[in-house]
Amino acid sequence: MEFVKCLGHPEEFYNLLRFRMGGRRNFIPKMDQDSLSSSLKTCYKYLNQTSRSFAAVIQALDGDIRHAICVFYLVLRALDTVEDDMSISVEKKIPLLCNFHTFLYDPEWRFTESKEKDRQVLEDFPTISLEFRNLAEKYQTVIDDICHRMGCGMAEFVDKDVTSKQDWDKYCHYVAGLVGIGLSRLFSASEFEDPIVGEDIECANSMGLFLQKTNIIRDYLEDQQEGRKFWPQEVWGRYIKKLEDFAKPENVDVAVQCLNELITNTLQHIPDVLTYLSRLRNQSVFNFCAIPQVMAIATLAACYNNQQVFKGVVKIRKGQAVTLMMDATNMPAVKAIIYQYIEEIYHRIPNSDPSSSKTKQVISKIRTQNLPNCQLISRSHYSPIYLSFIMLLAALSWQYLSTLSQVTEDYVQREH
């Protein structure tokens, strides 16, 4: 199937091949772990087990910020594992979430009652908390604060539905916006980035909301099948009586209309995303922040006006993901990528869609205010001979490429 997808996108196949043959190391270099303590090595092992995608970009970060963000990620992954575990009673879960930040200072605390797939980060939490206490105080302060605020926010929604659009923003702030705020404060504390990066809470929050809303939109069917509801009732309630009924074939038209409205809401975070990325100076930090954002806009474009969201999984192509990862290394390239995908959405807006005017307005504003000089990326320079060579190479090499690292696919799977 991936071979067939590549037939229409030879440049993506070329990038897949280049990535597999060593191009990955040009922007995600392998980290030398020989000098690490055994506990820190274990932390990186857990990082790779829970998220290969984040592991790759975290390990490419410069200096001591790399270890701080590794620990930050694992602490929040442990917290998130408690939130996701439906086998934990509400009575037990709420105090666990609210008090989780205090466990960072308890060398013995661990939780062995989880049934979740990532439960090892709870069962071996002493290893993670040890490395937390080994961090510089400036990093500990940020991680403690974000963990505390996130735990309390998660507790608020344990037994509460996402009803209004304000609730949606609030929930996404707790589970993702705070991550963006925490990362930004860590970047500034490390002095790799200017103080404004950590001080502008609104832009940092939007970075997280853009990613989280994209995940929630794309994962409608998976969440429904697992009994989770993250789409705001204020929106879907205008289209249908029960959220789960969007999956019924007879409701596909109103389902897509609701989908388009939520995507339009999410696109409004793009100006803040561009402002945030434009302030970054360290290349490794820029890559770390930019790659998920361009993956998100590509995912939104794939989901827009797409009935498949309610029937199965919508994912961007592996070659597309690799191309985005390799291209999104500077601000002009990121702007061009975002312009490309918002134009793709714009040209697919149905005139009959209830949100069509709003969607056009949002995209036009982004074009004018944030992307005034951008043009669509053209790859028409590939000659017929070159294309023929690519296709032949594809046929000969596909079996080899089928073993491509999962790092690219993880970027388009939900992060918990």
UniProtKB/Swiss-Prot annotation:
Binding site for NADP(+): 52, 77, 218, 315, 317
Presence of keyword 4Fe-4S: no
Cofactor list: Mg(2+)
Gene3D superfamilies on file: Farnesyl Diphosphate Synthase (1.10.600.10)
Catalytic activity: 2 (2E,6E)-farnesyl diphosphate + NADPH + H(+) = squalene + 2 diphosphate + NADP(+); 2 (2E,6E)-farnesyl diphosphate + NADH + H(+) = squalene + 2 diphosphate + NAD(+); presqualene diphosphate + NADH + H(+) = squalene + diphosphate + NAD(+); presqualene diphosphate + NADPH + H(+) = squalene + diphosphate + NADP(+)
EC number(s) reported in the record: 2.5.1.21
Subcellular location, principal: endoplasmic reticulum
Compartment annotation: Endoplasmic reticulum membrane
Protein name from the UniProt record: Squalene synthase
Disruption phenotype: Deficient mice are embryonic lethal around midgestation (9.5-10.5 dpc). Embryos exhibit severe growth retardation and defective neural tube closure.
Pathway of action: Terpene metabolism; lanosterol biosynthesis; lanosterol from farnesyl diphosphate: step 1/3
Recorded family membership: Belongs to the phytoene/squalene synthase family.
GO cellular component annotations of the record: endoplasmic reticulum membrane
Positions with a binding annotation for Mg(2+): 80, 83-84
MF (Gene Ontology): metal ion binding; squalene synthase [NAD(P)H] activity
Record keywords, A-Z: Cholesterol biosynthesis, Cholesterol metabolism, Endoplasmic reticulum, Isoprene biosynthesis, Lipid biosynthesis, Lipid metabolism, Magnesium, Membrane, Metal-binding, Multifunctional enzyme, NAD, NADP, Steroid biosynthesis, Steroid metabolism, Sterol biosynthesis, Sterol metabolism, Transferase, Transmembrane, Transmembrane helix
Membrane topology designation: Multi-pass membrane protein
One Pfam family per UniProt: SQS_PSY
GO biological process: cholesterol biosynthetic process; farnesyl diphosphate metabolic process; isoprenoid biosynthetic process
Functional summary from the UniProt entry: Catalyzes the condensation of 2 farnesyl pyrophosphate (FPP) moieties to form squalene. Proceeds in two distinct steps. In the first half-reaction, two molecules of FPP react to form the stable presqualene diphosphate intermediate (PSQPP), with concomitant release of a proton and a molecule of inorganic diphosphate. In the second half-reaction, PSQPP undergoes heterolysis, isomerization, and reduction with NADPH or NADH to form squalene. It is the first committed enzyme of the sterol biosynthesis pathway.
UniProt enzyme class: transferase
Transmembrane feature ranges: 284-304, 384-404
